[in-house]
């Protein structure tokens, strides 16, 4: 019954009511922004926007509501002008300049050398919002009719608003009517961009065949589709061992002799052929399926793809010849079949059939030379 105690109680109740009302007054956009940050989306744009919110709140508390609103409007105008003046499309080129890391047999590579010009790559940077979305639409309008795929690399995009998401959906539909396919690199169902697009009601169908974790995978999918459209055999087709790159220039009897020194091994999808750091005592000839060489032994999203091999090619020869351990791991992308040749088997052929062994070493050298030439050519094209 003490009046002072009653006063404290009333003040506490009023304070709670005021805090509840204050929290309810926070706009949904800020709630969503904080939710994105708490959900792990820590991009530069999110940090910048949170900093602006904190700045405006601090000015409001310090100088009052009117000054806070004025400061918020001024900062928003400055950020808007900067984003409007920033070019959303950082670079534009074709897959001729930036092909995938998959290595193809010579016949397929010869076809793709020109066909890659039909894969247009647009690297985006900044925020995809209503002000920049229109510029992206204009960029897409000037893409030639000969293009088969348009790949948007969204890894440099900090945020996507509702208008940006709608533009991507409309762009996908519009290109589809023209017989072209839109691919989004840097977008998966678990990625913030993927969640944002679906939250805005876009790209709701699942699973998505046009979303890829990175640009390399998107370009590879486009290359494989171009090969399929042209009726050229893909990696699922088995290739005879004598038609592989290791057996070039050998007659039937020599092929049989070398094959007698090799062992066949079948791999299930996802099975490891060798791990990073393993002893390098074999080279492998892939006759069916596909094998990818990756760095790191952790979860898939933490591993870096170096190269993927198609049927008919050899791998693991460099580490075997120099005697070092495996510098990366290799995993089967799908059911695969490989023939392995040990260093001891190659040495035995050298003693018993010097001319045959010389041809094998020559084929290995040509294989390595072709990979080096390809890497050099790509670097020269990328640097102008």
Residue ranges of predicted features:
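Cyclic nucleotide-binding regulatory module and flanking cytosolic helices
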Residues: 220-272, 310, 320, 381-383
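Short aromatic/basic micro-patch
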Residues: 151, 212, 249, 283, ...
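Helix-loop-helix junctions within the multi-pass membrane cores of secondary transporters/permeases
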Residues: 1-14, 18
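Polybasic "coupling" helices that flank or enter modular domains
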Residues: 362-384
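Short acidic-hydrophobic, aromatic-tinged amphipathic segments that line or gate anion-handling sites
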Residues: 205-217, 221
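Cyclic nucleotide-binding regulatory domains
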Residues: 266-335, 343-350, 354, 365
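Hydrophobic, membrane-facing alpha-helical anchors
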Residues: 13-29
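The feature marks cytosolic C-terminal regulatory regions of anion transporters and related permeases
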Residues: 24-189, 193, 199
């Amino acid at each position: 019954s003490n009046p002072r105690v009653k006063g404290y109680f009333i003040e506490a109740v009023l304070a709670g009511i005021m805090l509840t009302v204050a929290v309810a007054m926070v706009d949904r956009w800020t709630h969503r922004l904080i939710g994105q940050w708490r959900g792990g989306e820590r991009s530069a744009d999110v940090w910048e926007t949170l900093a602006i919110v904190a700045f405006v709140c601090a000015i409001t508390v310090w100088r009052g509501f009117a000054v806070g609103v004025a400061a918020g409007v001024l900062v928003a105008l400055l950020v808007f002008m900067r984003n409007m003046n920033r070019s959303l499309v950082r670079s534009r080129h074709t897959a001729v300049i930036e092909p995938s890391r998959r290595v193809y047999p010579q016949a397929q590579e010869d076809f793709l050398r020109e066909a890659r010009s039909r894969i247009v790559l647009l690297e985006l940077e900044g925020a995809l919002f209503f002000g920049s979305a229109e510029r992206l639409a204009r960029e897409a309008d000037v893409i030639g009719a000969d293009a088969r795929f348009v790949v948007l690399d969204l890894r440099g995009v900090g945020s996507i608003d509702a208008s940006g998401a709608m533009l991507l959906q409309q762009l996908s539909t519009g290109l589809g009517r023209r017989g072209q396919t839109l691919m989004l690199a840097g977008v998966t169902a678990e990625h913030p961009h993927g969640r944002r697009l679906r939250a805005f009601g876009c790209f709701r169908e699942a699973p998505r065949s046009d979303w890829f974790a990175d640009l390399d995978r998107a370009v590879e999918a486009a290359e494989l589709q171009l090969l399929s459209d042209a009726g050229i055999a893909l990696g699922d087709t088995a290739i005879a061992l004598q038609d592989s790159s290791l057996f070039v220039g050998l007659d039937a009897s020599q092929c049989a002799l070398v094959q007698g020194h090799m062992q066949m091994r079948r791999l299930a999808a996802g099975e490891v052929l060798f791990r990073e750091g393993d002893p390098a005592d074999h080279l492998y000839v892939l006759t069916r399926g596909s094998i990818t060489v990756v760095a790191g032994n952790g979860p898939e999203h933490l591993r870096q793809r170096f190269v993927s091999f198609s049927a008919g090619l050899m791998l693991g020869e460099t580490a075997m010849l120099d005697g070092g351990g495996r510098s990366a791991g290799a995993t089967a992308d799908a059911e695969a079949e490989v023939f392995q040749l040990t260093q001891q088997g190659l040495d035995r052929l050298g003693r018993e059939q010097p001319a045959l062994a010389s041809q094998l070493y020559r084929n290995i050298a040509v294989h390595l030379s072709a990979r080096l030439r390809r890497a050099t050519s790509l670097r020269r094209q990328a640097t102008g």
